[in-house]
Amino acid sequence: MLTKFNPTELQDIQNYYEQNGYVIVSKLLQESAIDNFLKEYNRFKARPFYVFRSQDTNQPELIRSNEQGFLEHSILDPQNLVFAKGFTSTVEKCITSTAISNLLKQLSGKDKHIIWQSMFFDKSTGTVAHQDHYYLDTDPAGHLIAAWFALEDIHPDAGCFFVVPGSHRGEVLERTASGFKDHEDFVSRTQQLISENNYQFKPCPLAKGDVLFWHPFTVHGAFTNINPQYSRKSFTAHFVPEGMNWRRQASLPEKVASSNPNVYFWKRDRLMDHLRFFKNYADFTIAQATKRKPKMEMRGIEYEQKS
């Protein structure tokens, strides 16, 4: 059974988060904002020959729906896509809502937050178990806050997000090489950590509008979809409290306010974004022709096949 809190139970939310390394808040997202996004998304995914960068393969992928009409790959930083204004504006309204910033303030004690990275999932990609700290975190560590937004009622067979409650108080794994060259070793070390501590995965089949927040040291991931008729439409976003230093980031770009003055994005060079869009076409074509493997694989099934 999932423990959930109403958005007004702020102190209980904070206490549960600090004790367990995650917390679920019921109906934090307005249904109208979700429905507006889904309407724009259905228009967006019908576009032919649109290439985006995927989080699960860390390379460009083509918009291509499966037999059930779901997009197989996650979209990295969907709010930054070009030639998709209706889509990106509805993404922004969901992940930067006042309800979200109020919860972030309660958890961090800071008024303002910056979005470091976000993703959209149509179908579960079966994300391998990990700690966010390896990829991105604050300095001093442990102040990043991540959130998973359910955009529909999530069926248990859809490839649920999972957490290991209390694992944020256990061992924290560090990156040991630049450019994520030790990523496969990190995945292996994480599996060893899970085994040695008998960590148990807690599935989180959220209801539409629920949001799950978690700590950067918390072990989490997503199960593989076991019933193709179920999608798992959801956002993930990572937030840094304003004024915090960022691990492994010597310099940071200028920040700009979103539609919510308490949530910021990094300022984008839109010319470069448009040029990168066309470069992604070339990279996708080359990857398909050469059968190039992803540099950093996030799909758990790929590691299961290797073992």
Where are these regions (language model features)?
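Non-heme Fe(II)-dependent double-stranded beta-helix
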Residues: 1-19, 26-129, 135-138
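Non-heme Fe(II)/2-oxoglutarate
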Residues: 2, 47-51, 55-58, 66-70, ...
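Double-stranded beta-helix
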Residues: 15, 154-219
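Short catalytic/ligand-binding loop motif for oxyanion handling, primarily in non-cytosolic enzymes
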Residues: 33-35, 125, 156-157, 171-172, ...
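A short beta-loop-beta micro-motif enriched in histidine and acidic residues
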Residues: 132-144, 199-200, 206, 230-231
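Short, conserved beta-strand element in jelly-roll/cupin
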Residues: 138-156, 205, 213, 238-242
